[in-house]
UniProtKB/Swiss-Prot annotation:
Region (Disordered) residue spans: 266-291
Regions that span the bilayer: 56-76, 134-154, 170-190, 211-231
Record lineage: Bacteria, Bacillati, Bacillota, Bacilli, Bacillales
Gene that encodes the chain: yidC
Protein's UniProt name: Membrane protein insertase YidC
Organism whose genome encodes this protein: Staphylococcus haemolyticus (strain JCSC1435)
Classification via PROSITE patterns: PROKAR_LIPOPROTEIN
Disulfide partners: none
Signal sequence, renumbered to the chain: 1-19
Length: 291
C-alpha cells in the first residue's frame, strides 16, 4: 500500500516542480516560499558560509545527515512494525486465507460485510493493525517539502553564496553533472533492492516497479537540476541503504522473538484441542461397546 501511494505522490511533485517559478524576485512570496524555500536558503547558506567556510558540498551532506537523524525514530518504528506484522501474518495466514475465500465467494453486501467483520476479528486476535503500515509514508511526507525547498534554492540560486563557491569534489554544485546523477540513480536502485529482500514474494512486484521508477525519476530531475540536488539524493540514498540493511537484520530477530510466545500459545491450544477431540472419540467408542 505504501509503495502504491508513492507513485502518484512522485508524479504530483513533478507537476508541482514544473509549475513554480522563483526566478523573479517578485514571485518569491506565498506560503510555500515563506515556509520552506526561504528557511532552507537561510539554513543552507548559514552552514555553507559561516560553519564550513564556504564549502557548500559539506553543508549539503550535513543537512542530509541532520534530516535523516530527525527521521530516524519514525523509520525505526516503521521497520519494527513491518517486521512484526510480517511475522504475525505468517501465524495468521491460514485463517486470513480462509476469510479471504469467503470475501471472494460473497455475493451480497451482507455477506461481504460479515466476511470483512470476520477478517477484523482475525486481525484483532493476532494483534495485527493494518493502519500502522500507513505510517510508513510519514518520513517521505516530512522530507518532501524539505527536498522541494532545497530544489528551488538550488535551481534559482536564492540567497547567493553557493553561486560564488560552487565547486565540490569534481563537479560544480549549481550545474547538472552526469556522474553524480548516475550515482544517485544507482544508489536509489540499491536502496529499493535492499528493502525488497525482506518482503514476502507476493508483495515484491510493486517494489520491483519502484526499483525502476524511482531511479528514473531521480535521474530525470537531476539531469535538469543543479548537481547539489544529486548530491543530496546520493547521500540520502547511501544513508538509507546502510540504515535499511542493519535495521532489517535487527528487527527481523526482534519480531521473531516477540511473536514466538504467540506461536507457542497457538500450538499449545491446537494440541489441547486435538487431545480433547481424541478423548471425546475414545469415550464415544467405549459407550458404544457398553451398549
Amino acid at each position: 500500500m505504501k509503495k502504491k501511494a508513492l507513485l502518484p505522490l512522485l508524479l504530483g511533485v513533478m507537476v508541482f516542480l514544473a509549475g513554480c517559478d522563483y526566478s523573479k524576485s517578485s514571485n518569491r512570496d506565498g506560503f510555500f516560499y515563506n515556509t520552506f524555500v526561504e528557511p532552507m536558503s537561510k539554513v543552507l547558506h548559514w552552514l555553507g558560509h559561516s560553519v564550513f567556510n564556504d564549502d557548500y558540498g559539506i553543508a549539503i551532506i550535513v543537512l542530509v545527515l541532520v534530516i535523516r537523524i530527525i527521521l530516524l525514530p519514525f523509520m525505526l518504528s516503521n521497520y519494527k512494525n513491518s517486521h512484526l506484522m510480517r511475522e504475525k501474518m505468517k501465524v495468521a495466514k491460514p485463517e486470513v486465507d480462509g476469510v479471504q475465500e469467503k470475501v471472494k465467494r460473497a455475493r451480497t453486501q451482507e455477506e461481504k460485510m460479515a466476511a470483512n467483520q470476520e477478517m477484523m476479528e482475525v486481525y484483532k486476535k493476532y494483534d495485527i493493525n493494518p493502519m500502522k503500515s500507513a505510517l510508513g509514508c510519514l518520513p517521505v511526507l516530512i522530507q518532501m517539502p524539505v527536498v522541494m525547498g532545497l530544489y528551488f534554492v538550488l535551481r534559482y540560486r536564492i540567497g547567493g553564496g553557493i553561486a560564488e563557491h560552487p565547486h565540490f569534489l569534481w563537479f560544480n554544485l549549481i550545474h547538472p553533472d552526469i556522474w553524480i546523477t548516475i550515482i544517485a540513480g544507482v544508489l536509489y536502485f540499491i536502496q529499493a533492492w535492499v528493502s525488497s529482500k525482506q518482503m514476502p514474494q507476493e508483495q515484491r512486484q510493486m517494489t520491483y516497479m519502484m526499483m525502476i521508477v524511482s531511479p528514473i525519476m531521480i535521474i530525470w530531475i537531476s539531469l535538469s537540476s543543479a548537481s547539489a540536488l544529486g548530491l543530496y539524493w546520493s547521500v540520502s540514498a547511501a544513508f538509507l541503504v546502510v540504515q535499511t540493511y542493519f535495521a532489517n537484520m535487527y528487527y527481523e530477530k526482534v519480531a521473531q522473538r516477540e511473536v514466538a510466545p504467540m506461536i507457542e500459545k497457538f500450538k499449545e491450544n491446537n494440541s489441547n484441542s486435538n487431545k480433547k477431540g481424541k478423548n471425546t472419540q475414545v469415550v464415544s467408542k467405549n459407550n458404544k461397546k457398553k451398549k
